[in-house]
Amino acid sequence: ARIDQDFLDRHEVGLIFGNDSTAEATMHGLDKFREFKDTSACGSGAIFQSMNSTVTMSLACIFKLRGINLTTSAACASGSHSVGLASLLIRDGLQDCIVCGGAQEANMYSVASFDGIQAFSLREDEPTKACRPFDRDRDGLVPGGGAATVILESYEHAVKRGAPILAEVVG
């Protein structure tokens, strides 16, 4: 996107990121509380580990972003919702440029929850047949974590700064 820290320092760039479940570190903090029967055993940083907004808070601090800072949480669609919301804010002229996407870790707690409702594919020994979301014969999900980021900006803003335009959000 040809965006460097100097650009971020000079412009009001926003950040909208999606994620939807608790980090493993939070669960370990709760284990300490249970063991010692004392909330101070969780540590002063526990609050930041337990909030979904920690991803956007951390990224905004690291990159010194001054625009909108928002976390979306809508299960597996959290990252997609961040892109949709960013495009609306840009379309309505409320932001020129927004970093958006999603991040989700896979940990034993989130995986166990899905396994508990028998949501996973039974074809784990056949990976090419396991994840087929639009297939009539699908039989479940494949667990995993990951992250993706896109930079959305108005057409005028992108042209003005000479950005390579790779795609357009329409609809």
Q: Where are the regions a protein language model picked out?
A:
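Alpha-helix C-terminal capping segments
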Residues: 60-64, 85-94
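Short-chain dehydrogenase/reductase
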Residues: 49, 76, 141, 145
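Condensing-enzyme catalytic core mediating Claisen C-C bond formation in acyl metabolism
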Residues: 125-171
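Active-site histidine-anchored catalytic micro-motif
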Residues: 82
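Conserved beta-ketoacyl condensing-enzyme motif
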Residues: 1-73, 103-111
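Short conserved active-site loop signatures built around small residues
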Residues: 79
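Acyl-CoA/ACP chain-elongation machinery
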Residues: 94-139
